[in-house]
Structures are given as C-alpha cells and as structure tokens.
C-alpha cells in the first residue's frame, strides 16, 4: 500500500481572499446562443455515456474480503463492521477528517457532509446505508454533529486499527517524513497563529484546533462495502478529486459563469463550516 500523502493534502493551498470576478464573455443573440448550446450538448451527452460506461466498470470491480474483525464505537454503543450495515447489504462510508487531536472537524469534510442528511432515506430505499467514520472519540463526534445539525450515523475508530489498516489514517511519524528536506516537522508543529494563516495547509489544521502533522494524518476517503452471507467485502474506494461526487456544490458551481473560482492550481480555501460563513457577504 502507498504511503504518499493523498486526499485533502493534494489540493489544499491556503489563500489570500479576493473579490470574485465575473469572466468576460461574448454577447450574442438567442439564436447564436442556442447553436453554441447545442454544440456543447453533444459533448455533454458523450460525457454522460462515458460516465455510464465507467460506472458499470466500477460496479464490476472484484471484491476484497475483510477477514479481520473490527469494532467501532457509535452513539448506540460498540458495533462490528457488519453491524454498521443496519440490516442492509451495502454500506457507503465516508472517512471524515476528525482525528483524536482535533477540536473540530475538517472544514472541507464538513462542507461535504452537509449534503448527507438529505440522501439517507433515498439510499436506504436502495438497500444502502451511509455512515461517516473518524478517529476522534465518539463524544467529540456527537458534540460536533449536534453543532452542525446532522443526523447521519457517525462511528469512531478511536481504539481500532481500522483507519490504519485501510490507510484512512497515517502514523504521525510517517507524515513527518513527508517534510524531510523541506519543512522540519518540529517547526510545523510550532507554527504561530500568523504563520498558520498562510502556511499550506496549516490554516485548515488551525481551524480544526490541531497541528499540521495531526491534520494530515487523516485522509478523506469514500469507500463502499457489501455484506454477503455474513462476510464483509470492500468493493470500491476513492479519494482526492474522486470525492467530488459527494461535493454537490461543485456540480452546481461548474454550471455558473464564474465556475468554482478557485484559481490554478485549485484553492478551496473559501470553504467554511456552514455556521462560519460571513452572513452579510452571503446575502
């Protein structure tokens, strides 16, 4: 298995905030616009067909049997991996970046999780249970879930090897090694608040109330498991830009003139927890 940094660490580059600017566009009459739209529609339909083909191949991946027993903590008590399915045969699991040393969940993961409440019943009707898993103790997770107003199931792997076995988390000494010859780990862990405002991705670490190494030790991952004849199998997993499928706001922003407006390379520093946005600016 790889030990390279993946996930949030790949695309977090902390910002200097600026006013969003509307790009210049050619102005045409409705007939010319319709012609241009129809040209784009051909490409969109091709992409849809390719996406359907890819989804079929994704479903056709071989299954990996999970032979080790894992027990995670939930608000209702300890649960085995099989029990997390809640009587269904398919389990979608989002590894939410919230380590034991965090005081709050990752802002990017929080923005993703905002969409989970609304899909739970729809997924249950399709024989799918959706759950988040983090390494923070269950008490921290429950308190944060109440703050955010979420009701999806959330399990703690605090005293389990689960995250490490599946590389949803990385040992701190491994993370420190990523900075050898670049930024000494001891300096990263002693960033001043001012340095944390501009260091990449120290701002998100500071937002979580933790140090950079502890922040990067957690990896956002979307995984799928199935339960068949009492055995649990992993059928799919993705991270980094593969997570955009659950970042619903991106699908909407990709269709407005200003787009994601994150620059090059992509800089998602605008993301906040939903109770932290400047409401006057939002209006």
Question: Where are each of the predicted segments found?
Answer:
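Residues at the C-termini of beta-strands that transition into short coil/loop
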Residues: 134, 156-158
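Catalytic nucleophile loop
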Residues: 124-141
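Non-globular targeting/processing and membrane-anchoring segments
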Residues: 2-91, 96-126, 143-149, 153, ...
């Amino acid at each position: 298995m790889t030990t390279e940094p993946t996930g949030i660490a790949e695309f977090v580059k902390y910002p200097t905030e600026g006013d969003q600017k509307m790009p210049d566009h050619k102005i045409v009459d409705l007939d010319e616009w319709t012609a241009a739209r129809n040209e784009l529609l051909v490409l969109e339909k091709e992409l849809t067909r390719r996406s359907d083909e890819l989804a079929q191949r994704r479903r056709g991946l071989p299954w990996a049997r999970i032979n080790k027993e894992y027990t995670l903590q939930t608000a209702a008590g300890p649960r085995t991996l099989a029990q997390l399915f809640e009587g269904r045969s398919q389990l979608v699991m989002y590894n939410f970046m919230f380590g034991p040393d965090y005081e709050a969940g990752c802002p990017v993961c929080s923005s993703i999780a905002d969409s989970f409440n609304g899909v739970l019943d729809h997924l249950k009707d399709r024989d799918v249970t959706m759950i988040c898993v983090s390494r923070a103790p269950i008490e921290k997770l429950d308190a944060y879930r109440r703050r955010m107003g979420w009701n999806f199931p959330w399990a703690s792997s605090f005293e389990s090897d689960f995250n490490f076995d599946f590389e949803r988390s990385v040992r701190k000494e491994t993370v420190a090694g990523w900075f050898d010859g670049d930024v000494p780990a001891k300096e990263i862990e002693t960033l001043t608040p001012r340095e944390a405002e501009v260091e990449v991705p120290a701002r998100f670490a500071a937002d979580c109330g933790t140090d950079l190494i502890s922040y990067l030790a957690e990896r956002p991952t979307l995984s799928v498991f199935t339960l068949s004849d009492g055995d649990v199998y992993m059928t799919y997993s993705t991270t980094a830009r593969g997570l955009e499928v659950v970042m619903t706001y991106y699908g909407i922003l990709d269709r407005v003139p200003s787009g994601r407006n994150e620059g090059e390379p992509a800089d998602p520093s605008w993301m906040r927890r939903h109770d932290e946005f400047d409401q006057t600016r939002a209006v």
